[in-house]
UniProtKB/Swiss-Prot annotation, chain A:
Keywords: ATP-binding, Cell cycle, Cytoplasm, Kinase, Nucleotide-binding, Nucleus, Phosphoprotein, Serine/threonine-protein kinase, Transferase. In contrast to classical MAPKs, the TXY motif within the activation loop is replaced by the SEG motif, whose phosphorylation activates the MAP kinases. Exclusively detected in the brain, where expression is restricted to the choroid plexus and hippocampus, and to a lesser extent in lung. Activated by phosphorylation in the activation loop. This is Mitogen-activated protein kinase 4.
Amino acid sequence: GCGGNGLVLSATDSRACRKVAVKKIVLSDARSMKHALREIKIIRRLDHDNIVKVYEVLGPKGSDLQGELFKFSVAYIVQEYMETDLACLLEQGTLTEEHAKLFMYQLLRGLKYIHSANVLHRDLKPANIFISTEDLVLKIGDFGLARIADQHYSHKGYLSEGLVTKWYRSPRLLLSPNNYTKAIDMWAAGCILAEMLTGKMLFAGAHELEQMQLILDTIPVVREEDKEELLRVMPSFVSSTWEVKRPLRKLLPDVNREAIDFLEKILTFSPMDR
Amino acid sequence: MSEDSNMEKAIKETSILEEYSINWTQKLGAGISGPVRVCVKKSTQERFALKILLDRPKARNEVRLHMMCATHSNIVEIIEVFANSVQFPHESSPRARLLIVMEMMEGGELFHRISQHRHFTEKQASQVTKQATLALQHCHLLNIAHRDLKPENLLFKDNSLDAPVKLCDFGFAKVDQGDLMTPQFTPYYVAPQVLEAQRRHQKEKSGLIPTSPTPYTYNKSCDLWSLGVIIYVMLCGYPPFYSKHHSRTIPKDMRKKIMTGSFEFPEEEWSQISEMAKDVVRKLLKVKPEERLTIEGVLDHPWLNSTEALDNVLPSAQLMMDKAVVAGIQQAHAEQLANMRIQDLKVSLKPLHSVNNPILRKRKLLGSKPKDGVYIHDHENGVEDSNVALEKLRDVIAQCILPQAGKGENEDEKLNEVMQEAWKYNRECKLLRDALQSFSWNGRGFTDKVDRLKLAEVVKQVIEEQTLPHEPQSSEIALLVCRAGTWKRL
């Protein structure tokens, strides 16, 4: 298939006799190569049941990258092969509640590990969450490569109406695109849980402004500083009473109360409350 | 060849800033190739639309095909093209780019127009159709397939009632030499032949069918199918082929509808729409290209040439106001653009009781569900302190490895802080103490410039030394309690 960051092929490592996924990354300049390799170093040090394992990183024709950081314009990441990803599964509809719980548990377990190493994923979404259909092991993949390898222009100001959708972005990240904290991964994890239970994306805005509107319709804003910032940034879209039109319980009527309670605690507007 | 040389001559090498000022922050829209901005000609103060592409063969192709077509009054005009080096704020160096100056379409997109004019009539719809068809005819006479015909690519010149409609965005366009086979489409408007090309392409790729010496191809008539879909949406406000679920790829039920040409004229909206209009739609949405209405057939159709009054107000204006419908369409577009693939594979999940999952295995070994709020430890206090010490060391590694976004001084201070914390919890570690001496650590900070990668490597060895006598940390904490205590236990 084609991952978001380039061509991804499955292959067999002939030395280690194991099936691997090989991802080709095209690096257009020295700076992005440097950033990508730094990210790769992070990934290679992460060793956990619920993180996709990166075995090695090679240059063209399988050459060793050691000491030749800036000579290549492509790199190949040899990593653990996983049969499918959560996006493919959700494509087919909802998961059972027990599958969703098992996957969510493993997702949080993986997040706890990387957050304890002070690493942020920053691009958590179903397509970056891999599932082994054999034993239902879930692994988080594609660490930060989307940001490093895809050097697309990112809006540094306030909300924009560009075509790029950011369905798993937390309200803080929508307001301040470069304000990355561990809490943004938790927001994305909450959206993913809701999607596993309902088969639908939780907040699927066509653009950032609408994304924020959808969030405000459902997630209450309780802190004064958040209200002040919203009034400054998008005054015409905020209702004067700060009422939510569709609280989570009404938005997800078929989801059981305990899962709703969990979602209400993880999908808070302020990152500090998450 | 002569066309190519003419095109190359038309591209200017001088800086665009000599003749135009550019509004970098105002974006008019986004095509498949990128955002479109406003620029102003300095000599006349005229406003134009500016599209900036990386200078690549694909971009040159887009420019060439658009320039070939742009002589028609229903196609957005290209004023001139510049080849300049441009550096955006997030880039470290300038890159070669094509800057395409086009006429400004002040009237905006077709759907937006329909939703604003709440009295959009069938006559107006037929007028839009005629102009779109004339634009398409012009392309096809040049043997060029547009391949991305959709309402977003139909723009009004201005806001007057009889403003002309023009076709834009040739990012997917291609000369039809009988070799159109690369699947290029956005959902809702995609022709069945393109879906079939996609299906075969995927099967060949995965080896399910051999790569054919005569690959499956489609032709310019895929644009006519898209035209049929656009007419349908204009008339009633929603697409003919749809799915109940918004999805990141074309859902199976929607694909099946497209492949079989199954659509309806629901009574609620279509009872007030003329039979002539329905006839055009039916004849365009034929699965077999040879059965499909031709361009000339559309232009000759009574619906486009009737002197009869077609003043009935269409329901599309009201339905177009329904934000959920528009958002759904836009969402599908955006997702499809970002993820040009269709998953054919059916994946099924095993029930939990028949799965050998490590988490489930551990729960069986423990024999019971964990108590509220309790981690299961091998050692109580020692492991707690040890965990903190290890976490501080990991923070040092993260600080060394993470890309340095800020100023050097701030980063150095952060490294000193993190190292100080780790030092506080790891004073007894001889390996760490010896290593830090070689990095000029004075107990509170580094006095010299630090090679961060080497420091990270050393700290990693310290962590490995501390964890070797015990099980890896991930096993020591056997279970994680979910944040919401009341959520059902796994």
